[in-house]
């Protein structure tokens, strides 16, 4: 057996979710919990935000730049003519109500909007305000989490029953052996979601073949979820709220790999109207900070996305790729010719570039690497691709 190439790396396991880089994360929650306000401050847009259920009917969508100090450093260093950061696609989806899976509220339209997304910002209200009605009559974010979770699970249940009915006709009664493995896997999924009333992502030991089947159906409960707790400005600043511990306990029990991020929509909205100087002074006085950057970065990472940089005086750009992407496919994000004629990737680590101060110094320090087609691109790599065309060899 020939020796394994040094840059082959460990075997890549498939990721649950849609393949690609034009992925979306949806803001999901009950009506009147601050979704549109959060969307507005996140995207600096002016989507309608009113005090009545279903203010958002058709989903609003926007691209949000992913904040990154590495990108800013490269821009300051090169002073390029063009600056292109990575972006997170965010969708503001109409409020869900109990019974949506059976058509209540906006029902199936709402759930189809979630289906079109690849991750979920699960927003919940943990502030009291007599002027803002709550669709359930009282503020109880743990109850609200359970409503959302159950509606998503029920929609998946509907999809599983339909799929199993079809597979049983073909694979079991029809004797199609090719579909029998899919049928067996779907029986396991049924047991997990319908019989045990769990979400797909709560099970962490799906094997490669099972993940392939899950990715065929893209169940709502398979989507990564980040829990965002909307607090009053007062509670956020003092870091105290009676619901925070209860929410954390629920998430730790049922969705232990998920993150819970408290924020204040009112605070973020107020900060948006301030100048940079006023904002800095206000945050210092209140001994607090905005968490919008953290939320955007967390959402981007939850979609299994990362990026590499190309950097020079013409342009500094962050190129979005899926985690685990090999060098030729990363090159193809720039141009298909780069992938077709791939020769090598010349790679610098950002930290090495920052420490050494220039590309030539990185080379002199022996930290400039030439990587082949089996190299897995890492987040923050600074890359120059060499590739062949029918006419000549080029470098970018």
Curated annotation (Swiss-Prot):
Belongs to the TRAFAC class OBG-HflX-like GTPase superfamily. OBG GTPase family. YchF/OLA1 subfamily. Monomer. ATP binds at residues 32-37, 231. Hydrolyzes ATP, and can also hydrolyze GTP with lower efficiency. Has lower affinity for GTP. Keywords: ATP-binding, Cytoplasm, Hydrolase, Magnesium, Metal-binding, Nucleotide-binding, Nucleus. Disulfide bonds: none annotated. A motif (Nuclear export signal) lies at residues 267-274. This is Obg-like ATPase 1. HAMAP family: YchF_OLA1_ATPase. InterPro entries: ATPase_YchF/OLA1 (IPR004396), Beta-grasp_dom_sf (IPR012675), G_OBG (IPR031167), GTP-bd (IPR006073), P-loop_NTPase (IPR027417), TGS (IPR004095), TGS-like (IPR012676), TGS-like_dom_sf (IPR023192). Residues 304-387 form the TGS domain.
